[in-house]
Amino acid sequence: MNTKQSRIRRARKTRAKIAAVKAIRLAIHRTNSHIYAQIISADGGTVMASASSNDKDLRGQLANGGTTAAAAAVGKRLAEKAKGLGIEKVAFDRAGFKFHGRVKALAEAAREGGLAF
């Protein structure tokens, strides 16, 4: 089993637990160049809010989209959008990535912005 398959296996287990609780989830995806985050409805069918380091407004502010500073900016932006929609509690879906570095920076910024998980 290679690294990607292991990550996908971990993600599948996490998503199954979140689906069983029927919680709104904050899903992330990390690449070398950018980080993406979405708030997905409890049924898993609708993206309610999204933010990424590749968005036009953030791209101008960031020198590089693959840094912890970029991840923190994405987390803060997503928390603002969620507050606008009245979402305060979510389940954090780290998509099998380690809770370290950019993933942790995004999560902490989202918490500071008012999201609870």
From Swiss-Prot:
HAMAP family: Ribosomal_uL18_B. Part of the 50S ribosomal subunit; part of the 5S rRNA/L5/L18/L25 subcomplex. Contacts the 5S and 23S rRNAs. PANTHER family: 39S RIBOSOMAL PROTEIN L18, MITOCHONDRIAL (PTHR12899), LARGE RIBOSOMAL SUBUNIT PROTEIN UL18M (PTHR12899:SF3). GO terms for cellular component: cytosolic large ribosomal subunit. Belongs to the universal ribosomal protein uL18 family. GO terms for molecular function: 5S rRNA binding; structural constituent of ribosome. Disulfide bonds: none annotated. Signal peptide: none annotated. This is one of the proteins that bind and probably mediate the attachment of the 5S RNA into the large ribosomal subunit, where it forms part of the central protuberance. One of its GO terms (biological process) is translation. The keyword RNA-binding applies. Gene3D superfamilies: 3.30.420.100. This is Large ribosomal subunit protein uL18. Keywords: Ribonucleoprotein, Ribosomal protein, RNA-binding, rRNA-binding. Pfam families: Ribosomal_L18p (PF00861).
